[in-house]
A protein has these predicted regions:
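Catalytic phosphate/metal-binding cores of nucleic-acid and nucleotide-processing enzymes, i.e., regions
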Residues: 1-154
C-alpha cells in the first residue's frame, strides 16, 4: 500500500474519530479500512493522477457482508484525484431523519461497475439504494448517526 492511500485512510479515520484497521482490513478480526463506534468504511482510491473513480458492485456486497455481525453502519468512500464520494444507504439516511432525494438512480444489478462522477446519485443493488454525497453532507449524516446511536445505547 502506498503512502497516499495510508494518508487518505488516516484522514478519513480522523474525520470520524475512528481508527485505520490493521492490514487495511485483511484480518479476520478487523474488516474494512476504517472503523469508528458508528461506521465501518471501505475506502477505494484511483491512481494518483486520475480524476475518474469507478464503483464496483462487489465492493458494496463485500461491505454489506462485513457489517452484518456488527453494530456499525456501512459507508463506502471513493477517492479520485480531486474529490471524495461518500456512499451511504438511503435507509440509514431515513433512520436519522434525512430525507434525501436522488437526481437519478442507477441499477447496479445489471452492471459490474460504473463511473461515479457526481453527487446526489443513487446506486441500487438488491433492495438497497446507496446515495452518493460530498464530505460535508456525509459529516452531517455521521453526526446524526452518532447522536442516534448514543440515544439508543448502541
Amino acid at each position: 500500500m502506498n503512502n497516499r492511500v495510508k494518508k487518505i485512510e488516516k484522514d478519513v479515520a480522523k474525520m470520524v474519530g475512528g481508527k485505520r484497521c490493521v492490514g487495511s482490513g485483511n484480518q479476520w478480526f478487523e474488516k474494512s479500512d476504517v472503523q469508528s463506534d458508528v461506521v465501518q468504511m471501505e475506502i477505494k482510491t484511483t491512481q494518483k493522477y486520475k480524476d475518474v473513480v469507478i464503483l464496483k458492485r462487489i465492493w458494496i456486497s463485500k461491505l454489506m457482508r462485513e457489517v452484518q455481525n456488527t453494530s456499525r453502519y456501512p459507508v463506502l468512500v471513493l477517492v479520485s484525484k480531486s474529490r471524495k464520494y461518500f456512499l451511504v444507504m438511503k435507509m440509514v439516511l431515513n433512520l436519522v431523519g434525512m430525507n434525501v432525494s436522488c437526481d437519478r438512480v442507477v441499477d447496479m444489478s445489471i452492471r459490474k461497475s460504473i463511473v461515479v462522477d457526481d453527487y446526489n446519485i443513487g446506486y441500487k443493488l438488491g433492495s438497497h439504494i446507496w446515495v452518493c454525497m460530498c464530505e460535508d453532507d456525509f459529516m452531517k449524516v455521521y453526526n446524526r448517526l452518532k447522536a442516534f446511536s448514543n440515544r439508543d445505547g448502541k
